């Protein structure tokens, strides 16, 4: 017996929903100037860059190629950490659980601070592999981000510049960062644990942190593959405001210095807005 056919109009609408790309990520009106400054900077640099920066206080965002997918490399380890910590919060796991002879807390420390790939795959195996991370991302409604392979599998394969697996858009990454920060997916205790590890990231001294004023608090996670250089995380502004930042770089050269320049441009724009607001307040007194 033949299965009933979908009405033609319904079938066409389903196909269209799959094939039509999502609307381009747009910068907030008040940050168009910052978008232009970043675009001008990147126009003079070889390679492809994707940037998103989200003000966690008021929700304003700047985006350059923010809806373009880039290989995540080791920045995916934040999603792995979040998946494990969410299960800790649900009482299903503990940071004291032993994973290949070490407490889970130590394994996660190696994964985030040192970007240890073996520790990452050990934690990932405990969770059930990449499919478990993808299920968690889907449950949190974070489109534009996917995990397909273990780190060992990822490193064995070539062609990272054109890879369509294990990718994220900059906007998807700052969406994940926002959820990690605002308490919607992690308890305060788990959030504090993860951010403390990110603040000690040992692989990012030449990226987001490099050109920021001394003493600026940064919590980040880097990612590196052949031809791929990434850094994502949080910058705390002088007024306490926090900005989630994702910078993905593909191809070209001198990618680390460019990421540092991008971070400084973002920092200066948000710092200027703080100073301008203070000046206006003083004038109105």
Regions found by a protein language model. Give the residues of each.
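Bacterial N-terminal signal peptides
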Residues: 9-21
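Soluble periplasmic/extracytoplasmic beta-strand elements of cell-envelope proteins
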Residues: 50-55, 63, 79, 112, ...
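Short, conserved catalytic-motif segment at the N-terminal edge
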Residues: 40, 46-70, 93
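Structured C-terminal helix/loop/strand segments within mature extracytoplasmic catalytic/sensor domains
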Residues: 27-41, 69, 126, 175-205, ...
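Bacterial N-terminal signal peptides that target proteins for export
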Residues: 1-11
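Mid-domain, small-residue-enriched loop/turn segments at the edges of structured enzyme/sensor domains
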Residues: 48, 121-182
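Conserved catalytic neighborhood of penicillin-recognizing serine enzymes
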Residues: 93-133, 161, 166
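Active-site SXXK
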Residues: 59, 70-99, 111, 245
